[in-house]
Amino acid sequence: MPPCYPFLLSWEGWARDPPGRPGGAMRAHIITYGCQMNEYDSHLVASELVSLGWELVDSVEEADFVLVNTCAVRGKPVEKVRSLLGQLRKEKERRGLLIGMMGCLAQLDEGQQMAKKFGVDVLLGPGALTSLPEALKANERFFDLTFREDVLDYIPPPPKGALSAHVTIIRGCNHHCTYCIVPTTRGPEVSRHPDLILKEIELLKQAGVVEVTLLGQNVNSYGKDQPGFPSFAELLRMVGGMGIPRVRFLTSHPVNFTDDIIEAIAETPAICRYIHLPVQSGSDRVLRRMAREYRRAHYLERIRKIREALPDAVLSTDIIVGFPGETEEDFQETLSLYDEVGYDQAYMFIYSPRPGTPAYKHFQDLPREVKVERLMRLIEKQKEWSYRRNLEWVGKTVEVLVRGEAKEEGFVQGHDRGNHPVLVPASQAPVPGLYQVEIKQATPHLLFGEVVGAEAPAPIPLPVA
């Protein structure tokens, strides 16, 4: 049994009848911050709660137990959690609400102090999710921060009615970038058994899922920690041959994005030609301070290999602006790399100091106004390239997975195999599913199209870019 750290609860455990509903099921509500890994973990614990007889509800007001899945990668989601816990504590004092906290922030001293301050009853680190049944039987506050070996063994049931789903294949990270807290919060890399991965995907396929995304902090390292496991390239081929129409993966590391992975993508039609390859900076000096383990030339060589084998590949990246010590010259090197690659999409952030990381301990942060000004320039660069790339799709026919209503009136939204958001008239795609769509118009952020063979819709004014 993993160690736990007991404190007295404000009421007599979780086994009693819900307040005001004698004999009724206990009700839980889950709030998720952060990445797709957190979304997957929330689905995992949600299915676990249902199997234990709990009812999932859509709001804090309906719930007896609110579980907050936290993110610690940047400061903003941490502050959101702090604010939310303050609100939940008031509900706890008013009506005996139980509060749970999980995810990366829960693994850190900062999160544990927050949990004690705001009266959190259950605190589970990312490696202790399978302790939830034990926690729910407790009559004491339950904290578990261990990395349990069985956390990768659980296969959650397919999400009801979902056409796309995530599947975790590896947890943790063996890289130690100076800005990143993930190796601390999620531990070293541990690959999931391939039989469990394939079984989960088969269940998703039987449930009607047509798109699966393989998840990990560094999916490219899959299998390296377990003798006898397939490599990531081999796993891609296995999953790509299962009959799922669309297979994606997140996230990659340039050091581990090897030629055999590129070959597997090129030779397996089911694998989408969307590659997210975080560069973080175009400056070798900054990459060295980040401890990214590669340099600009290596990254560009990987891009060249990808373009050579996959000329239709859609490329996206992550970039951190204003890392400690970044000069204007360093930033110009990032802008020039952006031009050299010509990304379709990018996720850009100003550097956020995270306590417990080497960068936080050893480097002095830049003034916020410098970071924000550089970010604005990079965003303009990104919009310019995204628009240029999106225009290349006008007149082409693409496969779009329509998910549901768009914010724009009269349209439904989906995404193509290159992960572009695509809007089509709602009358042409009345139900979610896969459609062949001819792209008619592009903006920097969206593609607009019409379903091939569908009756021409009444004119709908397209949103202004």
From Swiss-Prot:
Enzyme class name: transferase
Catalytic activity reported: N(6)-dimethylallyladenosine(37) in tRNA + (sulfur carrier)-SH + AH2 + 2 S-adenosyl-L-methionine = 2-methylsulfanyl-N(6)-dimethylallyladenosine(37) in tRNA + (sulfur carrier)-H + 5'-deoxyadenosine + L-methionine + A + S-adenosyl-L-homocysteine + 2 H(+)
Subcellular location: Cytoplasm
Cofactor note: Binds 2 [4Fe-4S] clusters. One cluster is coordinated with 3 cysteines and an exchangeable S-adenosyl-L-methionine.
InterPro entries linked: Elp3/MiaA/NifB-like_rSAM, Methylthiotransferase, Methylthiotransferase_CS, Methylthiotransferase_N, Methylthiotransferase_N_sf, MiaB_methiolase, rSAM, rSAM_horseshoe
Gene3D superfamilies linked to this entry: Methylthiotransferase, N-terminal domain, tm_1862 like domain
All residue ranges annotated as the TRAM domain in the record: 391-453
Enzyme Commission identifier(s): 2.8.4.3
Functional note: Catalyzes the methylthiolation of N6-(dimethylallyl)adenosine (i(6)A), leading to the formation of 2-methylthio-N6-(dimethylallyl)adenosine (ms(2)i(6)A) at position 37 in tRNAs that read codons beginning with uridine.
Name of the protein in its database record: tRNA-2-methylthio-N(6)-dimethylallyladenosine synthase
Organism: Thermus thermophilus (strain ATCC BAA-163 / DSM 7039 / HB27)
